[in-house]
Amino acid sequence: MTRVRQSLNRLSYLYYKAKESDEALDTESQNAVETLEKVVKAIYELQKKPPGDANSFFNLAGYHGEPFQGQGTTDPNWWGGYCHHANVLFPTWHRMYLLRYEDAMRTVPGCEDVALPFWDECELDQDKKPMPIPEVLTREKFRLDGQDIPNPLFSYKLQKELKHEVDGAAHRYSKPLDYQTVRYPRSGLVGNAWDRLATRSQNADYAHHDWCTILLNRNVSSWLQGNIKITPDGIKETRIADTTSVLGRYNYCLDASTYTIFSNVTSQKNAPIDIFPSPTSLESPHNAIHLAVGGFYQPGAYNANEIPGANGDMGDNETASFDPIFFFHHCFVDYVFWLWQRRHGSTTKLEIDPNDPGAVLQEGVGNMPPKTKLSMDTDLQPFKKTAQLYWKSKDLVNIEEIEGNHGYKYGPGSLDHLASPRKPVASPIRGPEKGDDKVKKVKKITVNRAVHRGSFVIRMFAKPPGKRELIEIGREPVLSRWDVEECDNCRDKLDVHLLVPLTGGMLDYLGGDDRGEKITYLGAVQAYGQMDFTANLQDMVHDAAAENLQDVHPSAVKLVQDVALPLR
């Protein structure tokens, strides 16, 4: 029977409502209670299995990143995990990963028909604001079979240490036995003495669970809406254009014209930009949620939505999958993937552009060396279909007809109304009377990942002529490794870009160009406590952000520049 993946938001809401009520349960509520208890029981049992068990949570989580395998154990030119990011296999590899995890859940007695729910990240409340993270993902305890147990959906305690031994990485992602995964605003960096000291201080400041849950929900909501609140010294609070919000990115990625562009950030950056909104890949909002849940450093911020020193496990590829929320997040990502397929008539076939840079491995993965060509026939290691064969992307195109009793469907979700193609959307920033949605120019920031350790965010600002304010017009979260600077292939190949298309309406709103006045554009990289603006700042802006400037790296952020249209 085809398994159905339901909204965890709905299941969690009905479950806790039922537990707090003395009234008889209706059918939907009773089913929700039974379904959620099966999900919790299955994951709880997987977490209790010894690490060497093929179906243990430790083993399954370890497929993604740590513990590293093969050449990637020490060689920074290789990725020591099996996951695919920034290439065309990102959606399909993670689709297979979820199936493997779900299959393991189904080995637990009494859970043979369980399906993994999805955290519906785009669900809005009656005020059109993002819903909080489902309560079952943030409670410390869960009552199962008459006993209160450590909630296996909230955190996981390592049953075996993780040794991060990549050359030049300073053991940053090493974790001891019994390490407990954490989320924003806490830190889980304990691999070396400096990180342990910083983490001890950070977590002492955020020791109260309920308060941390409030801060986590606020932070995720801020990312989803595109609201950013930073130090008011010359940079005023501003709502970011919808295309830079995570809600907007999830919406706009459904307009990507090809699977190649839709699938990953590398191909997204190579796509032509001649319309608004610009092409967005599924991987882009996916990255942002990782950073929102795991945390990243916001220097000088007064708002609790962005707290310095927050470095939870979801913020890094190496350890993200050990946080149980990872799988519910990726289940939503797969829901959006399937929605894109339905929207574009691609439920039975997906095509990869073999000439696209996203169809080539940038660093070695598994036993595939750098520069390996990727296709729908590439093995999705380590997932075995038979004793001799691996699953391939072409096996997973139609989710309802995957062989071997692996077919599944999605229950109702917040983006179901986008299953049909829509007309082009007008620019969210328009002139006072008439909006011009034609792209007039594109601005670009290029950042070398090797210069910045770990994950970071590229940000772009515009300063209207004659004004003291900076308006943020674009941002791109980059989910990255700590040890990229030791990777020869990464240094040579892995520049990342933020591209911001500017329509006539946006330029009119900013008050320049067509009026003969000059708009100033500035770039910034925000990561691990530093706000690195571009070189040659005007004194006014430099003074306004002086508190946040610790180092300026002109080689890391190139001055925002015009880009010719169309981009290729």
Language model: regions and residue ranges:
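C-terminal accessory segments of proteins
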Residues: M1-R568
